[in-house]
């Protein structure tokens, strides 16, 4: 049994990255062995070697359409569970699991696997199912990512709904707004708030899997973070589309794509919409993000200057993910060792970013992560509008665009 005193630094956030305990354990064991205080500093190479990305996922979606409307949606997700790695010495920690609504008794669904897969669109019949890939859970152990919920689920949902809109011959903006109507469970909560621990399906569409958040313990309720429900998200979408010039005539091989997101399983969601203008070279598949238009309703904005900087930074992070960021595994280890192999966005690729903060006067919520979630689907939808190529995986490389153009 170790007796170790940990000196904490009271500074900064890490978008979830500081919840990993590996460095703490290593320092604790070293301090115990040498009998002296130990400060552990990783090299960049060791940091890459011990990184934990989000889990690889595979998605299968089906849509039921009738009279020009989306009336049913089924979303199956195969992925690794995130919870086991944080449950030291156990298979799962109960605080990482949520109830399976098939029987409402057993906590056997990893909440992080389906975050973002439900949404604020009104679809009368909506089912989400998560399938645990045990091999993936342990081969590619997952951790936090700067997105709030899972950006890959939001990428899938927004890309799929865009495909449905085109299949129905409807304008993607009008189609989204028609479903962000605040009906049913998507109305949000009343101004009076609700009791701590209230299941999120209180204010969401019917789910195959229930999404109670938080599951246990005493929590201070957020009185008005979800007031307005889908209508606040629709307002963000109108603003973002307007700032991007949705519907205007564009140069050849240039398109605008839309996307919205809000962490539906959280008690304090932030409402965000994004529009991306993209130009594609049809000969090479290379594309440039010309402009990102982001509209965000964070309730009450306490510091507009810092909030704008956070929104811009998260949007760049989203652009970096869709353009080039990728981790490869070889013989169980991450192949990339430093930034000469792992390629985040470079200054030459930075688009113009136009931010609109919507002051709704409601309870303040977070701004550091949400805008990253709308960039990738907006870019993917813009590429389709530019050259008719639908890419269904990330990152969206020039090779992937060319391949999609051949299939189109």
Could you tell me what each predicted segment is?
Residues 1-408:
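Cofactor-binding beta-sheet edge motifs in enzyme active sites
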């Amino acid at each position: 049994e170790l007796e170790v005193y940990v000196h904490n630094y009271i500074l900064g956030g890490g978008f979830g990255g500081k919840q990993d305990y590996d460095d703490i354990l290593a320092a604790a064991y070293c301090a115990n062995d040498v009998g002296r205080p130990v400060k552990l500093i990783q090299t960049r190479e060791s940091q890459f070697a011990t990184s934990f990305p989000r889990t690889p996922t595979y998605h299968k979606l089906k849509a039921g359409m009738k009279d020009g409307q989306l009336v049913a949606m089924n979303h199956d997700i195969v992925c690794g569970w995130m919870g086991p790695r944080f449950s030291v010495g156990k298979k799962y920690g109960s605080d990482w699991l949520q109830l399976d609504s098939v029987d409402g008794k057993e906590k056997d669904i990893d909440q992080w696997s389906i975050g973002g897969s439900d949404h604020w669109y009104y679809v009368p019949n909506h089912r989400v199912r998560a399938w645990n890939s045990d091999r993936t859970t342990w081969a590619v152990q997952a951790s936090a990512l700067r997105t709030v919920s899972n950006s890959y689920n939001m990428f899938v949902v927004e890309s799929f709904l865009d495909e449905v809109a085109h299949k129905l011959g409807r304008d993607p903006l009008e189609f989204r707004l028609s479903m962000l109507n605040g009906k049913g469970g998507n109305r949000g909560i009343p101004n009076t708030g609700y009791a701590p621990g209230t299941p999120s399906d209180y204010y969401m569409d019917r789910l195959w899997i229930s999404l109670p958040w938080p599951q246990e313990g005493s929590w201070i309720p957020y009185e008005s973070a979800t007031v307005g429900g889908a209508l606040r998200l629709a307002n963000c979408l109108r603003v973002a589309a307007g700032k991007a010039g949705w519907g205007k005539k564009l140069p050849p091989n240039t398109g605008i794509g839309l996307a919205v997101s809000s962490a539906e399983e959280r008690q304090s969601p932030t409402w965000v919409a994004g529009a991306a203008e993209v130009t594609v070279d049809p000969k090479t598949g290379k594309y440039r993000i010309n402009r990102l238009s982001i509209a965000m309703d964070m309730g009450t904005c306490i510091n507009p200057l810092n909030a704008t900087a956070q929104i811009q930074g998260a949007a760049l992070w989203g652009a970096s993910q869709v353009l080039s960021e990728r981790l490869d595994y070889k013989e169980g280890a991450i192949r990339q060792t430093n930034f000469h192999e792992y390629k985040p966005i470079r200054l030459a690729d930075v688009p113009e970013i136009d931010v609109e903060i919507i002051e709704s006067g409601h309870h303040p919520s977070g701004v550091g992560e949400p805008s990253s979630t709308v960039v990738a689907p907006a870019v993917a939808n813009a590429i389709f509008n530019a050259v008719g190529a639908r890419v269904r995986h990330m990152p969206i490389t020039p090779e992937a665009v060319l391949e999609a153009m051949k299939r189109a």
